[in-house]
Amino acid sequence: VQRVEEPSGLPVRSQSWELTGLRRALGPARDHARQFLEAGSDDLAEDLLQDALVVVAELVSNAIRHAPGPCVLTLSQDGGRLLVSVRDGSASSPAPRPPDLSAGGGGFGWHLVQRLSERVEVYTHGESGKTVTATLVLVGGVKRCEV
């Protein structure tokens, strides 16, 4: 685990994992996230842990589905906030689409990420890709993004 100091002087825990661009990367991504969160907090509520794991799975799944090649998952915990970042090789911004309730075609992920997160940001890196970062509140009353 890498530790860096923020200007506030508070330590930030951060760790990154390179994942294949294959669906089998979803399980390891969730496992990494669970281990990271459990190592950083003895009293993280189960519902908040599950919310974080859903956000990790959805962001990694979107990267695998819509971007070529591997992606990088980075988790950073700063006090009561968790930043879930996924960098992929597509410069296209995520585009919400209507959920497909009949054919099982998805469409729920981006809506879930926005609903479970306090904030979601997309940073583009020219033609080399983008990073999607979701910020989750891990303590107290959870303020969620407006959908």
Task: Name these PLM-found stretches.
Residues V1-T20, I64-V147:
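Conserved beta-strand-loop-beta-strand hairpin that lines the nucleotide-binding pocket
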Residues E5, R23, A52, E58, ...:
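Solvent-exposed, flexible loop/coil residues
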Residues V55, V60, I64-R65:
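Short, well-structured hydrophobic secondary-structure segments
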Residues D31-A57:
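Conserved short strand/loop->alpha-helix "switch" segment adjacent to the catalytic nucleotide/phosphoryl-transfer site
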Residues P11-D31, Q35:
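Short beta-to-alpha transition helix within the HATPase_c
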